[in-house]
């Protein structure tokens, strides 16, 4: 039996970690989720990003969590402002989601759609299925992302029964 060199062993471990990461991303593509645009505004400026990693934590007090990639263009602005609005998208918002999910400059992102504000001042998409206006209460390290624990301070609920979903790397309507 031959002994493996330390370099070869390290290369195999790296490849294994890379493969595990790829396998995980492929598996997560099979987990359907609502599409949201998360926005912020305040002293650090206005920014927003598309997110599917959003879920309820508690109803007393009303609390949501959002996962924010540390490499996202909105990362520093969101963290500095300390407020967000989670806007859950309707079926007709696919183009808007694409704008907020890519490299489009913030000004162009917000030029699309009609925006208002609630208590925190974070942009509220006027025709979102629901908008959760939040203050960021805590942030936790989650690897490549921060896990933001957010207290809901106001909500806007609109009529509509077709949600924009993301499943298997494609938009779907539910």
Curated annotation (Swiss-Prot):
Coiled coil, from the record: none
InterPro entries per record: Flavin_Rdtase-like_dom, NADH-dep_flavin_reductase, RutF, Split_barrel_FMN-bd
BP terms from Gene Ontology: nitrogen utilization; uracil catabolic process
EC number: 1.5.1.42
Enzyme class: oxidoreductase
Gene3D superfamilies named among the record's database cross-references: Electron Transport, Fmn-binding Protein, Chain A
Keywords: Flavoprotein, FMN, NAD, Oxidoreductase
Record's keyword annotation contains Repeat: no
Reaction catalysed by this enzyme: FMNH2 + NAD(+) = FMN + NADH + 2 H(+)
MF GO annotations: FMN binding; FMN reductase (NADH) activity; FMN reductase [NAD(P)H] activity; riboflavin reductase (NADPH) activity
Domain of life: Bacteria
The family this protein is said to belong to: Belongs to the non-flavoprotein flavin reductase family. RutF subfamily.
Matches recorded under PANTHER family: FLAVIN REDUCTASE, FMN REDUCTASE (NADH) RUTF
Role played: Catalyzes the reduction of FMN to FMNH2 which is used to reduce pyrimidine by RutA via the Rut pathway.
Protein name (Swiss-Prot/TrEMBL): FMN reductase (NADH) RutF
């Amino acid at each position: 039996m031959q002994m493996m060199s330390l370099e070869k062993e390290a290369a195999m471990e790296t490849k294994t970690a890379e493969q595990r990461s790829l396998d995980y991303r492929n598996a997560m593509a099979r987990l359907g989720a609502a599409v949201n645009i998360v926005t912020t505004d305040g002293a650090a400026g206005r920014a927003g990003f598309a997110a599917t990693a959003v879920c309820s934590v508690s109803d007393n007090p009303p609390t949501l969590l959002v996962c924010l990639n540390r490499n996202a263009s909105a990362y520093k602005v969101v963290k500095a402002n300390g407020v967000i609005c989670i806007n859950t998208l309707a079926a007709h918002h696919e183009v808007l989601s694409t704008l907020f999910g890519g490299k489009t400059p913030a000004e162009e992102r917000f030029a699309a759609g009609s925006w208002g504000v609630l208590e925190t001042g974070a942009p509220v998409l006027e025709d979102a299925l629901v908008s959760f206006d939040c203050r960021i209460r805590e942030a936790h390290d989650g690897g490549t992302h921060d896990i933001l624990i957010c207290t809901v301070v106001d909500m806007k609920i609109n009529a509509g029964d077709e949600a924009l979903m993301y499943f298997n790397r494609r938009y779907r309507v539910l």
